[in-house]
Design a protein with these regions (language model features):
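Conserved C-terminal "switch" segment of AAA+ ATPases
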Residues: 12-17, 30, 167, 181-253, ...
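Pre-Walker A (pre-P-loop) alpha-helix and adjacent loop at the N terminus of AAA/AAA+ ATPase modules
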Residues: 13-59
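Conserved alpha-helical scaffold flanking the Walker A/P-loop in AAA+ ATPase domains
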Residues: 40-43, 96-116
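Conserved AAA+/SF3 P-loop NTPase catalytic/coupling segment centered on the Walker-B
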Residues: 88, 109-136, 150, 165-174, ...
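AAA+/SF3 P-loop NTPase mechanochemical coupling elements
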Residues: 104-113, 142-159, 170-179
Length: 330
């Protein structure tokens, strides 16, 4: 790709990504701190991928996606997952009307642009798979009719850390459908003081709608057009391959710590998330730093740890760090 095209593309990205700062400012009006969370929400939104959030209750996970939906002027719904939830409670069902003596379709809360699946690991596998199928297919079948889900469609699922009681861990195949897994941490001291002050004063700012859903659909197309060199493609595939055969990259010590590596879906997600990150940084091309910036979020839920790794308290983040240090940067 010649430099003229890259310059044109860069100018176009500069123009098209001007809303990113406005959207971030709008969200920061409502959410104190959690910059990492806000950034990853934008990456998921622009890369057309769903997000899994892990963190203890009370860290503004619900508030974050609700605020994003308000700023994009889109429909938001929240599904609280509980042990007695049924698939019909998520996707919808047929209701018999005595008046018309016919079955009528009642759509479930999945029919929204932004869906918060709260505490997804509190529900049995049957309900989890109904949601994850809708995420993958972007359509839902009720009775014998199939309905397309609205665009843009973004699911943000939250889960409590597995140590907490009464949880059903998500199977690996289903976790793989989430583009990003973001670990949400506690706010800093100063931020928490500001949160307390805002609550004491009773002043709760609201996000104003600054975008339309169509703007997001257009921005996604621009993100796809962000230029990725073949060297960067090879770099991404090398990182993912190193999770499967670490010994080929001089990381023999990791072989006994990894039970399974990341799937090809990880390579696709890493590529799209890197493009979205470059777009957020107002660049028309991907550089290795973009790939490294999103590596943890894309790979942390796609690498299986052996019992040996768990016994030694090795985390997937440590394994990813070793891989990034070992794989040659283009």
């Amino acid at each position: 790709m010649d430099s003229i095209n890259i310059k044109e593309l860069n100018d176009r990205i500069q123009q098209e990504s001007s809303f990113v700062d406005l959207l971030t400012m709008e969200m920061n009006k409502v959410i104190v701190g959690q910059k990492h969370l806000v950034e990853n929400l934008l990456i998921g939104l622009l890369a057309n991928g769903h997000i899994l959030l892990e963190g203890v209750p009370g860290l503004a996970k619900t508030l974050a996606i609700n605020t994003l939906a308000s700023a994009v002027d889109a429909k938001f719904s929240r599904i609280q997952f509980t042990p007695d939830l049924l698939p019909a409670d998520v996707i919808g069902t047929l209701i018999y009307s005595q008046k018309s003596e016919q079955f009528q379709i009642r759509k479930g809360p999945i029919f929204a642009n932004f869906v918060l699946a709260d505490e997804i690991n509190r529900s049995p596998a049957k309900v989890q798979s109904a949601l994850l199928e809708a995420m993958q297919e972007r359509q839902v079948t009720i009775g014998d009719e199939t309905f397309k889900l609205p665009e843009p469609f973004l699911v943000m699922a939250t889960q409590n850390p597995i140590e907490q009681e009464g949880t059903y861990p998500l199977p690996e195949a289903q976790v793989d459908r989430f583009m990003l897994k973001v670990v949400v941490d506690y706010p800093k001291k100063e931020e928490e003081r500001l949160i307390v002050r805002m609550n004491n004063s009773g002043e709760f700012p609201k996000a104003s709608p600054i975008l339309k859903p169509e703007d997001i659909i257009r921005a996604r197309q621009v993100v796809r057009d962000v230029y990725m060199d073949e060297k960067i493609e090879r770099y991404i595939v090398d990182i993912v391959y190193a999770t499967r055969t670490p010994e080929d990259y001089g990381l023999g010590k990791l072989k006994n710590l990894i039970s399974y590596g990341a799937s090809p879906r990880a390579s696709i997600s890493l590529s799209m998330a890197s493009k979205a990150y470059a777009f957020i940084k107002r660049r028309g091309y991907v550089i290795p730093e973009d790939v490294r910036a999103v590596c943890n979020e894309v790979l942390r839920h796609r690498i299986g740890l052996t019992y040996e790794a768990e016994a030694e308290n090795v985390t997937t983040e440590q394994i990813i760090a070793e891989i990034i240090n070992a794989v040659e940067v283009p």
